[in-house]
Amino acid sequence: MSEQRALKNPYPDYTGLGCAQDLFDMQGNLTQHFATSISSKISELLAILENGLKNADPRDCTGYTGWAGIALLYLHLHSVFGDPTFLQRALDYVNRSLRSLTQRWVTFLCGDAGPLAIAAVVYHRLQKHQESDECLNRLLQLQPSVVQGKGRLPDELLYGRTGYLYSLIFVNQQFQQEKIPFQYIQQICDAILESGQILSQRNKIQDQSPLMYEWYQEEYVGAAHGLSGIYYYLMQPGLVAGQDRVFSLVKPSVNYVCQLKFPSGNYAPCVGDARDLLVHWCHGSPGVIYMLIQAFKVFGVRQYLEDALQCGEVIWQRGLLKKGYGLCHGAAGNAYGFLALYKITQDPKHLYRACMFADWCMNYGRHGCRTPDTPFSLFEGMAGTIYFLADLLQPARAKFPCFEV
């Protein structure tokens, strides 16, 4: 049943450096020929994207399906290629986003924090420091309501506290300085921890998992709405005040997620769901893998890496999705799992597999995949595929956008 959601992987698997010699060298640098073919495909897809965006929703400000996501793509292209016209495009699109903020959601991907954070970085690169500071001030004005959890704010990435947390981390990483004071970040993490403890105790599972989170009364597991996405951030160095709490609260909660693994190596969308169906970044191995790799980095337990490697096998076998080529539930998003494994292991097999998924993406539209609701957006559509292809040009620096830190 699960196989029906993916197309059969037509690529031969990695057998040694010989099969990858046209793709990259022993240091993981792409060959000039392969890099040139990726760059030309990016240019080709950008022309299609720009034309398609003429019919996009003018009021969608978000990173997920709207203008902020397109702005982030161009900001990324500016980082990779250094072309100032990309930065100007980022400014054009982020200004559209700022004109139509939700006034409701507070996250990077689906709310107002993303447009404000992206705008602050774009303005900063353009030396427009007053405008940049204004966006940062507006971003920080949201912080008290996020800590307090106003409006029954959830904790997950797309609509909750973690999504606001990422916005603050994004700013500090892009500015390469502590532009957002660290106590603001730790206060968010404290609130996330407290919320997780309350639900765990309410559900009487604190002995199994000291933390628990839900979204619309469901205990989601994946990166977008669930436990693995939240724990990935709570294990980042220094975000949680007091390393003892990472060991006493986060580690056993991570272990609880590990116990939910299917025999295949995949993970359910929700606690208690026995169907091994989804191999997406949002639900399944391609999102859980980041939690596992971070747990291995922090706790040094080999089993976390073994589980992450098993996620890689699931992605290789079932990751070329009929849903298309996007980030959230598509081939590009799934390919980032290989890049994460490559960065932690330096095993060229994982870079090779990412290159094969890139080849699939470079044949965009030729596999009979479904057309997304927002076919040119960052998380559902073509913009996300372009973002991935640009990231593959420098694999050691690649990060899943709006998520990986």
From Swiss-Prot:
It is found in: Cytoplasm; Cell membrane. GO terms for molecular function: glutathione binding; glutathione transferase activity; zinc ion binding. It catalyses: RX + glutathione = an S-substituted glutathione + a halide anion + H(+); 1-chloro-2,4-dinitrobenzene + glutathione = 2,4-dinitrophenyl-S-glutathione + chloride + H(+). Its main location: cytoplasm. Keywords: Cell membrane, Cytoplasm, Membrane, Metal-binding, Transferase, Zinc. It is a peripheral membrane protein. GO terms for cellular component: cytoplasm; plasma membrane. InterPro entries: 6hp_glycosidase-like_sf, LANC-like, LanC-like_prot_euk. Glutathione binds at K323, R370, T371, P372, D373. Its EC number is 2.5.1.18. Pfam families: LANC_like (PF05147). It comes from the Eukaryota. GO terms for biological process: carbohydrate metabolic process; peptide modification. Functions as a glutathione transferase. Catalyzes conjugation of the glutathione (GSH) to artificial substrates 1-chloro-2,4-dinitrobenzene (CDNB) and p-nitrophenyl acetate. Binds glutathione. Belongs to the LanC-like protein family. This is Glutathione S-transferase LANCL1. It comes from Danio rerio (Zebrafish). The gene is lancl1.
